[in-house]
Amino acid sequence: MSLEEIIARCLEVGINCLGIADHNTLAGALKMKEIAPFPIIPGEEILTSDGEVIGFFLSQEIPSNLSMKETVAQIKAQDGLVCIPHPYDRLRFSVFRDQAFDDIMPDVDIIEAFNARSLSPGSSTRAWELARKYGKPASAGSDAHTLPEIGNAYVEMPDFNDKDEFLASLAKGKICGNRSNPTARLVSTWNRLKKRWS
């Protein structure tokens, strides 16, 4: 997907603010912030030794394969927000242990309670329970790897001007959307394998 295609898709489905969290890179999000006609929240989905974590409102890329604690510390050093994505999606190898939740939860800002690519409704239920247990705002993510997936999950929330207002607005937000077609995961997996082989 090109950045221009992503912008066109967002405009088509009525998205007026977009959080971008590519795997282990911030480059696309920062470039998108320069060219998009709507607000962009730059993020990075970072693979740690304990699982994945997302940093939002970042300005510098954070390396992968650090510990969860080290990664969270680097997000906070940039005054970013820490989001736990798809915490109970057991089809992903990146889900970390429950014990890790307890260790980092004081520094977590957001729990992704609905991920459009998570095939099990039970994973969303448990994620909601986790957010309530710790009093964290819940978010939703399309986790889009293909254009048609953009907008499958979103949050209707009041406008905001900065990171702190974003968190307050998110707490008042309404999660909307539907699960992606399971074939979307097959398509993105195939595309990833093609890149490796070429």
Locate predicted features.
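Active-site flanking residues adjacent to catalytic metal/cofactor-binding acidic residues
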Residues: 21, 44, 85, 142
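Charged catalytic cores and adjacent phosphate/nucleic-acid-binding surfaces used
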Residues: 1-8, 27-42, 48-66, 70-73, ...
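Divalent metal-dependent hydrolysis catalytic cores, especially in the metallo-beta-lactamase
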Residues: 6-24, 80-83
